[in-house]
């Protein structure tokens, strides 16, 4: 018997049902890699970021996430080059899907009990996605932003429901806008932290304060 179509599990109806000591025998999710490309490049390398945002409340299977990751990675590698981007899958398939297997052979009514004890066995995993939640993000240089949008457009066909491609105003994966990031960096108030950046706080003794300058906790 083949895999049940994901359209049967698309709507969010029940509470989250994660893998636990009460829910055993869950098959591994199809997606195992969530960061692709130049994931070790610093925060200053890639200033632009493009998001694929879900516009529906639904379940997205691990198979769909893996298919979208492959499609996006393939196009970006071909058009921009494997060193020119960092792709991140932003949702994780923690919700377990169940199936109550039914026999369809002759004399099946003698072997099975129908809907009695119909809780079902684990069949696969999916991610519970809300409206406005980011599914995929690509950070790159400004000249590759068009390629990133096209790569996410191709990845969009792997998902059910509606999605939107949004070009972020933020610097890469950080929470700062591009102008704000450049200003804070020129003031020495930003510390690189991998693909992200830390804002240095303005704390310290009044006696240690230089006139017209903020306190920097790293100083």
UniProtKB/Swiss-Prot annotation:
A biological process term (GO) from this entry: translation
Keyword terms: Ribonucleoprotein, Ribosomal protein
InterPro entries: Ribosomal_uL16, Ribosomal_uL16_CS_euk_arc, Ribosomal_uL16_dom, Ribosomal_uL16_euk_arch, Ribosomal_uL16_sf
Family from the record: Belongs to the universal ribosomal protein uL16 family.
Subunit-structure text: Component of the small ribosomal subunit. Mature ribosomes consist of a small (40S) and a large (60S) subunit. The 40S subunit contains about 33 different proteins and 1 molecule of RNA (18S). The 60S subunit contains about 49 different proteins and 3 molecules of RNA (25S, 5.8S and 5S).
Protein name: Large ribosomal subunit protein uL16y
One term under GO cellular component: ribonucleoprotein complex
Species of the source: Oryza sativa subsp. indica (Rice)
């Amino acid at each position: 018997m083949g895999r049940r179509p994901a359209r049967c599990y698309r709507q969010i109806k029940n509470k989250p049902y994660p893998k636990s000591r009460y829910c055993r025998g869950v098959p591994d999710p199809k997606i195992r890699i969530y960061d692709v490309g130049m994931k070790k490049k610093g925060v200053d390398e890639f200033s632009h970021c493009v998001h694929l945002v879900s516009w529906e409340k639904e379940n997205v299977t691990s198979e769909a996430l893996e298919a979208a990751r492959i499609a996006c990675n393939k196009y970006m590698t071909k058009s921009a080059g494997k060193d020119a981007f960092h792709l991140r899958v932003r949702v994780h398939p923690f919700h377990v899907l169940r199936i109550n297997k039914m026999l369809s052979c002759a004399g099946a009514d003698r072997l099975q009990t129908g809907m009695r004890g119909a809780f079902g066995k684990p069949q696969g995993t999916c991610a519970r996605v809300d409206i406005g939640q980011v599914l995929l993000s690509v950070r790159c240089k400004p000249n590759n932003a068009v390629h990133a949008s096209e790569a996410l457009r191709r990845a969009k066909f792997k998902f059910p429901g509606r999605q939107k491609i949004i070009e972020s105003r933020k610097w890469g994966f950080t929470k700062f806008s591009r102008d704000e990031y450049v200003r804070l960096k020129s003031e020495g108030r930003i510390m690189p932290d991998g693909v992200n950046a830390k804002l240095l706080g303005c704390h310290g003794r009044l006696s240690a304060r230089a006139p017209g300058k903020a306190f920097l906790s790293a100083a």
